[in-house]
A protein has these predicted regions:
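Intrinsically disordered, low-structural-confidence terminal and linker regions
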Residues: 3-9, 32-34
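Concave beta-strand-loop units of leucine-rich repeat
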Residues: 30, 35-128, 134-147, 153-173, ...
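Long, solvent-exposed N-terminal ectodomains/accessory regions
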Residues: 9-16, 22-24
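Conserved acidic
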Residues: 1, 20, 28-31, 78
């Protein structure tokens, strides 16, 4: 197979190429060891390889999260999803054989990239299956969402814009789903070119717990008091986190390629997982100390303007820590103040060259060795980092 990188329109090329350098092919797997989603043209199919995962370009595959160690069977658009009686599903797990139904609306809708293929059943048959089986999760290849009120059992909805869609979607049918808890909206045109604006009123989605959105369209998820997980990329409006959310239960925050300059306000949330990737304007992370009691996983990936990492020594409950970038850390002595840490990887330079603090961690990885280091990566512990990370 031929793997050709695809460059999304508007992406910061330096950051993207740095991410591509962390993609390797091993044992038939394509591993993305960066914290940035990348795209490849694989024998004519455009494939998204999510950050921190590995995929095998043969359709259904086991995807391993390189950060948490968790393994789940998912589909990332390599060839064809699992087909059962003409219906397509994005989970091949034998215990969840009806998980994540792919719904084409209208029947003529086609997935971007062409990897899912045409529907084997009509929209009406998809609606009937959802209601008969009381399905809770669906991914919609969307040109029209007007059918959603007829599927009240849905709790998790992923929306992918149909190929060639050049108009705004009407998201108001989502407001009539009584049990919606998780909503993911993929970037139009796979994020490769600018697409239609996304306009949605999150205040009309009571009970929403998880939101995943892309692009710089104005979102009011900050007014959702039940939000527990938030992933946002390309947000150019917020310079700090003071008005990020009104939710008192926000546990997981992932920001990618946003205009954030300071983490001021982050201490208001009981965050357990924070991922900061390619935030080129981010300069101050000192507010992380306000999350010391709850924070268990922290990823700082290519946020080049951050120079002061002294707040790390206050994060005594961390279990997973990833520090990637071109900055210099004075030393790694802060690791000794993290008794629960079981996973640490870094590519930043350690000024004093002493890597011995890594020896007390079950799993440690040095991605860029230096001549003045007193240990090489092969000398660092490589024990299993546990059963993976789960939000409490």
């Amino acid at each position: 197979m031929e793997y050709t990188p695809v460059y999304p329109e508007g992406i910061e090329r330096e950051a993207y190429e740095a991410a591509l350098e962390k993609c390797v092919i091993s044992g038939g797997w394509l591993l993305n060891q960066s914290m940035l989603d990348v795209w490849f043209d694989i024998d004519g199919f455009v494939v998204k390889v999510p950050a921190g995962t590995r995929v095998r370009p043969d359709g259904w595959t086991l995807v391993r999260n390189l950060v948490s160690g968790m393994e789940t069977e998912e589909f990332y658009g390599c060839t064809a999803p699992v087909n059962r009686c003409g219906f397509k599903f994005l989970s091949g797990h034998k215990l969840y054989i009806y998980n994540d139904l792919v719904v084409f609306s209208p029947d003529s809708a086609r997935a971007q990239g062409g990897y899912i293929g045409p529907p084997g059943r009509t929209l009406e048959e998809h609606i009937a299956l959802i209601n008969t089986m009381k399905l809770q999760k669906a991914t919609i290849i969307a040109g029209d969402l007007s059918f959603l009120p007829r599927c009240p059992s849905l709790r998790t909805v992923g929306i992918q814009f149909a190929q060639g869609l050049d108009r705004e979607l009407d998201f108001s049918p989502l407001y009539q789903l009584p049990h919606l808890e998780s909503l993911s909206i993929a970037a139009p045109n796979m994020g490769l070119t600018k697409g239609p604006a996304i306009r949605i009123d999150f205040t009309k989605l009571p009970g929403l717990r998880s939101v995943s959105v892309c692009t710089n369209d104005p979102y009011n998820y900050d007014q959702v008091p039940t939000l527990e997980q938030l992933w946002h990329s390309n947000d150019k409006r917020h310079r700090d986190l003071t008005d990020l959310s009104c939710s008192p239960v926000l546990k997981k925050l992932e920001l990618l390629c946003c205009a954030t300059k300071s983490l001021e306000g982050i201490g208001r949330f009981p965050l357990q997982w924070v991922s900061l990737s390619y935030l080129r304007g981010l300069e101050d992370i000192s507010a992380l100390s306000g999350c010391a009691e709850t924070l268990r996983i922290l990823n700082i990936d290519h946020c080049g303007r951050v120079k002061d990492f002294s707040c790390l020594q206050e994060l005594v409950n961390l279990e997973y820590l990833i520090l990637d970038g071109s900055q210099t850390l004075p030393d790694l002595r802060f690791l000794k103040k993290m008794p629960k840490l079981k996973f640490f990887t870094f590519s930043m330079t350690v000024e004093d060259g002493d890597l011995t603090p890594c020896l007390d961690i079950p799993y440690a990885r040095c991605d860029k060795g230096k001549k003045h280091y007193n240990l090489k990566d092969k000398d660092l512990p490589k024990e299993h980092a546990g059963s993976g990370f789960h939000l409490i």
